[in-house]
């Protein structure tokens, strides 16, 4: 069910009283799961997002992500001056005010990072491209469930780490709702605590790592950006060892898949590419919204999923 238009004469206080969370019925959520499981042709438009309703519904703590300055979307929604500005923007620029637009405007007005859910169909697409009916995918940074949904929808087993207790619990709630417990192994630990040597081989590693301190998910000391105080130190002491450990788990024909981009003065995509190249893994293709590999060095500031192989 699409969200209704807002009252064109809504006041700022009335706008602030609206529940900005995504809320779907059980029927809508199950239909979205079926839609994801049936996808075999993958569109590149931003409105193509099977399975996303499940992520949006089950992770309300998404709105508590803080910027490096310590402000979250939830904080902004309670800021009268900011919300009044957003309301006036909408009234001046649009004939109809929609909650979806208001959410985007709050991110912009609040100077927040453009946080997003990983599209479940991207992980499904990676798996279907392997041609394997069965396999194991490891995700060192589980996050909001998108990679889990795509993996299980394709018939593979999903193994992941998630240090944030609230996110871990929400993942388990989603697992129980869909009845996919036998297809998921989830650890409430940071990626660096995972026992890579004992795990055995996997077919694909797929993750979207923290963008250093661009998004602060929790004040928990287990978060990697609390342990390494500069981007370069974080890359050397956390990201590169993580990639090395993940690649060590791969079968000979395995794929190392990373959703990253460069941001501010932090060359995250460049670092991920360079680390893989040192391990003799090269980028074979990318996934994203109309993202050709031809100009890989000029698109690394875009949010892409890079697929590396030997």
Residue ranges and their predicted role:
Residues 1-53, 60-76, 82-310:
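Class I S-adenosyl-L-methionine-dependent methyltransferase catalytic core
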